[in-house]
Amino acid sequence: MAIRRWLLERQKSTQAATSDDDTLSPLRSAAAAVTATATATTAVPPTLQDSAQAPSSPPPKRQRVIVGQQWQQPDSTRKVREGQVECQNDRSIRNPDSTDPRRGHSDLDAVPVIHLQGEANCLKCFRYRVQKHKDVLFVKASSTWHWACGNGDKTAFVTLWYKSQEQRAEFLTRVHLPKGVKALPGYMSAFV
């Protein structure tokens, strides 16, 4: 806005000077033409011409779910519909036809495992001793691990994977566990 006023004042002063000095009038008219084209090309947009008008506010944010409130505006950035779980694979999560009573409704691709629980160094030594029989006794062995949160118990775990329940049962009958080590049988999803 200030630039526009300055240009108008300059044009008025140029016109007044033209009447005083007719010899420079061709140059001044050319300068006025250049100034007029510059004003036309650098015109201020109509939305910003009125200095009293404030710039528009950003779009409103998506509403959050409030306790007791049952609806939320849909998240347009996600492609998963409400009630669905986003997953990298399309495998079935549960097997309702499972016949194993211990497994209940377990994953279709769950493998039998044993979590060996005990003192960390004892578990490492045990894993090293049974490693030479790996092909017969188990498929995989994990490193020693601990729970990150909880009651602060320093108990360590080593997880052994098996091809079948029969291989796991054979392991439990053939191998003598060291004193202080407990075997916790279970199933884990095969994420290999």
UniProtKB/Swiss-Prot annotation:
Kindly indicate whether the keyword Nucleotide-binding belongs to this entry. no
Show the segment(s) annotated as Disordered: 38-106
Q: Name one Pfam family in it.
A: PPV_E2_C
Localization, UniProt? Host nucleus
Q: Where is the composition biased (Basic and acidic residues)?
A: 76-106
Q: What is its main location?
A: host cell
**What molecular functions are annotated in GO for this chain?**
DNA binding; DNA-binding transcription factor activity
Q: Which GO terms describe its biological process?
A: regulation of DNA replication
Q: What SUPFAM superfamilies does the database record attribute to this sequence?
A: Viral DNA-binding domain (SSF54957)
Compositional bias annotation for Low complexity: 38-47
GO cellular component labels: host cell nucleus
Keywords from the UniProt entry: Host nucleus
Q: What does this protein do?
A: Plays a role in limiting the replication of viral DNA in keratinocytes. Recruits the host NCoR/SMRT complex to viral replication foci to mediate repression of both viral replication and transcription.
Give the protein family.
Belongs to the papillomaviridae E8^E2C protein family.
Q: What is this protein called?
A: Protein E8^E2C
Q: What is the native source organism of this protein?
A: Human papillomavirus 57
At the highest ranks, the source species' classification is: Viruses, Monodnaviria, Shotokuvirae, Cossaviricota, Papovaviricetes
